Amino acid sequence: MPHSYGIRARTRYTFQRGFREHGQIRLSTYLKTYKVGDIVDIKVNGAVQKGMPHKYYHGKTGVVYNVTQSSVGVLIYKVVGNRYMEKRVNVRIEHVKHSKCRQDFLDRVKANEAKRKEAKAQGKTVQLRRQPAPPAKAHFVSTENNEPVTLHPVAYDTTI
């Protein structure tokens, strides 16, 4: 039963550094550029206490709305009751990383553009929309060496 309700209460494993990731923070963390409109993930780095967001925001994805020298402002939507509340959180860059949530979409856009150019050069039309997977091919099941088995439920038996 916890008794303290501090800002970092019950974060023993949440703010833990990863395996073999202890020690000094990599320089690449500070060399990344963030622009307004970038989609970022908040991942708290337990080694840096300054600019640390509340534990609720750990693992959340938001949009950068403000950039300063050592921190970024992130816009996050928090579920409160039956509505979404817009939260603006100022976080140091050690606790933020670029999100990969749009990478699949951007790769698909590039692939579609290449397909469109190729089809235009050949004078053909191409289907660029994703299609659902078709149903499995029809086939016959042989019972020659594969006898059907009838399954019955096992009766419940109490052993007291």
UniProtKB/Swiss-Prot annotation:
Subcellular location: Cytoplasm
Complexes and interactors: Component of the large ribosomal subunit (LSU). Mature yeast ribosomes consist of a small (40S) and a large (60S) subunit. The 40S small subunit contains 1 molecule of ribosomal RNA (18S rRNA) and at least 33 different proteins. The large 60S subunit contains 3 rRNA molecules (25S, 5.8S and 5S rRNA) and at least 46 different proteins.
PROSITE patterns: RIBOSOMAL_L21E
Protein name: Large ribosomal subunit protein eL21A
GO biological process, any: cytoplasmic translation
Disulfide bond residue pairs: none
Family: Belongs to the eukaryotic ribosomal protein eL21 family.
Keyword Nucleotide-binding: no
GO cellular component: cytosol; cytosolic large ribosomal subunit; preribosome
Residue ranges of the region described as Disordered: 114-138
UniProt key word DNA damage: no
Signal peptide: none
Organism: Schizosaccharomyces pombe (strain 972 / ATCC 24843) (Fission yeast)
Gene3D superfamilies registered for this protein in UniProt: 6.10.250.3260, Ribosomal protein L21
Keywords carried by this UniProt record: Cytoplasm, Ribonucleoprotein, Ribosomal protein
Further information: There are 2 genes for eL21 in S.pombe.
GO molecular function: structural constituent of ribosome
Function: Component of the ribosome, a large ribonucleoprotein complex responsible for the synthesis of proteins in the cell. The small ribosomal subunit (SSU) binds messenger RNAs (mRNAs) and translates the encoded message by selecting cognate aminoacyl-transfer RNA (tRNA) molecules. The large subunit (LSU) contains the ribosomal catalytic site termed the peptidyl transferase center (PTC), which catalyzes the formation of peptide bonds, thereby polymerizing the amino acids delivered by tRNAs into a polypeptide chain.
